Amino acid sequence: MSTVTKLLLPLALAAAISACSKPADTAAPADTTAAAPAEAAAAQAAPEVAPIQVASGTYKLDPTHTDVLVQWTHMGFSNPSAHFGNVDGTLVYDAADVTKSSVEVTLPLSGLNAFTAKFDEHLRSADFFDAAKFPTATFKSTKVEAAGTNKLTVTGDLTVKGTTKPVTLDVTINGAGEHPMLKLPSVGFDATTTLKRSDFGVGAYAPAVSDEVKVRITTEASIPKAE
């Protein structure tokens, strides 16, 4: 065997071994396009929210479990809130034709609470609500419409400090049925809206204190026993 052959033989063997041990080309990624329709079908097959059945009748709001919370921005630093308690109101609900439903609510300003006595006094002063002259705020619906499953849109007249303006509430029905404690037909709602203080003559210190206020309402109401 020549010297050249002796030198090339180990190289040839190494090349052969390398070729045998080289892994097969990586398999092409699986086609995932078929999974997309399957996922979409699964999403469409998700159960829909069941409609809550609210009994027709005249409901009385429960002030213990009714809260009207308002929130604003203070000089860009904080988002304080206040709430109206001792709310009095009546809801007439027509299950056959929700557009025939109505609601009337009275908010006594004596129930206004910003969690600080001095601030409560300021809010009730002539700078804001002037509660001595205007002791209550009221809301009276003018239109009730279905807005999807367990959703309503309630439009009405809000009167604050002698000024009346139209307001629209986005309402969610939380639940309905016999109240486990009261044993009465009952219903619970949440509602939200956004107002401008200046529309009702309580726009003091705007815009440092935001003119817009967010309103969140939660309530329970029951049909009283017949007397």
Task: Label the predicted regions.
Residues 20-227:
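Low-complexity, acidic/polar, glycine-enriched regions of mature
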Residues 1-18:
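Sec-dependent bacterial lipoprotein signal peptides
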